[in-house]
Amino acid sequence: MSGHSKWATTKHKKAAIDAKRGKLFAKLIKNIEIAARLGGGDPDGNPSLYDAIYKAKKASMPADNIARAVKRGAGAEDGAANYEDIVYEGYAPAGVGLIIECLTDNRNRAAAEVRSTLTKGNGSLATSGSVSFNFERKGQIVVPSEGVDFDKLFETAAEAGAEDVTDDGEVFTVVTGPSDLFTVRKALQEAGFDYDSADQVMQPKNEVELSLEDARKVSKLIDNLDDLDDVQNIYSNWTASDEVMAQLDEE
């Protein structure tokens, strides 16, 4: 299984990185608020909140920001927005399928911005089900590979119920069934493995391999969608050769 479609990133100048950091914090805060609202403000009894907080800490979010987000979500502090989940399906250039997950307090704004961004990037919105049939919900745990024994990780994950472990270079990716995510994550923690994130994701069943030119177009469109405030996650079914990925990383 290729990891390119999940881990492909392009390098940005410092200003762009700083801007993305601010947007990342906003997305992480939304995740924390929603998790606390749905499952309560105690991370020990709310695995989704535990993972949302853990991911925010990994991104170096200040502890005070995290604590306030938990309180807002749990109703202990005013200021929480009334977010709703919306999922859009779309196409990028070269027939690449996109699933765009939004958390928004304004459905009309989210729809207009997603549609406009897709159109400007030579993509389009798709009817419900026309893209998602090629994806399936999975749990995904990302483990930094440095200093980690792959065989030990694989054995620990498999015994806990994981479906697969792949070597994606700087990280190992543990794939689970959606209901097994927390069990496998806990088993890895107890075995001493550090991890970057544990999330529910949409994994493509089939991937489209792109040329450098098409990969540039699709990457730019996904970046522009990710910049939208209402967009939380984007999943796609594109991949590319190692040579193409190396060229993208240099740009």
UniProtKB/Swiss-Prot annotation:
Cross-referenced InterPro entries: Integrase-like_N, TACO1_YebC-like_2nd/3rd_dom, TACO1_YebC_N, Transcrip_reg_TACO1-like, Transcrip_reg_TACO1-like_dom3, YebC-like
Compartment(s): Cytoplasm
Keywords: Cytoplasm, DNA-binding, Transcription, Transcription regulation
Transcription recorded as keyword: yes
A Pfam family reported for this protein in Swiss-Prot or TrEMBL: TACO1_YebC_N
Coiled-coil ranges per UniProt: none
Signal peptide location: none
Record's GO cellular component terms: cytosol
Family membership: Belongs to the TACO1 family.
UniProt-recorded name of the protein: Probable transcriptional regulatory protein BL0726
UniProt source species: Bifidobacterium longum (strain NCC 2705)
